[in-house]
Amino acid sequence: MQFSKMHGLGNDFVVVDAVTQNVYFPEEVIKKLADRHRGIGFDQMLIVEPPYDPELDFHYRIFNADGSEVAQCGNGARCFARFVTLKGLTDKKDIAVSTTNGKMILTVQDDGMIRVNMGEPVWEPAKIPFIANKFEKNYILRTDIQTVLCGAVSMGNPHCTLVVDDVETANVTELGPLLENHERFPERVNVGFMQVINPNHIKLRVYERGAGETQACGSGACAAAAIGIMQGLLENKVQVDLPGGSLWIEWQGEGHPLYMTGDATHVYDGVIKL
């Protein structure tokens, strides 16, 4: 199997072309490949498939290191666009892809950065999914070690984001897994810890569902910015500083799609026997 190793701000991926090669990945194979000591090592595996819809260019599948399939990965989307361009699978600047729960437009800009139309944030609790009687700007979540206030949203995958005074000292290691597996999130959740620097600038750490804390989480950056804008803490354009680097998020509010802009890096190509 031929593959490429890529990263978006340190959030690392193995990307596989399933357009020109036949591949099949049972959960156990994904876990073995994800092992950083005995396999290749990655946060997520991205599969480029032929489009299911003739009006689209590709189908985009994402698997976590634990073998679970997820519907969205923002950093992965940028790497997906870089990969299909580098490999000559398309020469389009605007690339239309489907995911397991929607469609996305990936734009390769003239400056090399990649802008992703992430669609509209979804606030309705049942669609996140999140157990709540009605939408609220903040929800109270109780854990064994701490009770927190957080916003909840879906960016194609479930996110909760809480505001902290200092991301460096935030209790991500303990609180992250407790919130990820909280009973009110039936499909688990990605957990963001957000420090507001000013209305156009935040710092963020993300404990990802099925992957733990990563260097960067694109959909997590989108979720944090959307929640901050919705809560009146942030303006429409936000720089998000993650441990691995920065992303730029733009959202004009309800009824508008949210855009994420950032880099995507090709590290190396390889071949591995399955």
From Swiss-Prot:
GO MF: diaminopimelate epimerase activity
Pathway: Amino-acid biosynthesis; L-lysine biosynthesis via DAP pathway; DL-2,6-diaminopimelate from LL-2,6-diaminopimelate: step 1/1
Catalytic activity: (2S,6S)-2,6-diaminopimelate = meso-2,6-diaminopimelate
Record-linked InterPro entries: DAP_epimerase_AS (IPR018510), DAP_epimerase_DapF (IPR001653)
Gene3D superfamilies found in the cross-reference section: Diaminopimelate Epimerase, Chain A, domain 1 (3.10.310.10)
Subunit structure: Homodimer.
Protein name as it appears in the record: Diaminopimelate epimerase
Organism in which the protein naturally occurs: Mannheimia succiniciproducens (strain KCTC 0769BP / MBEL55E)
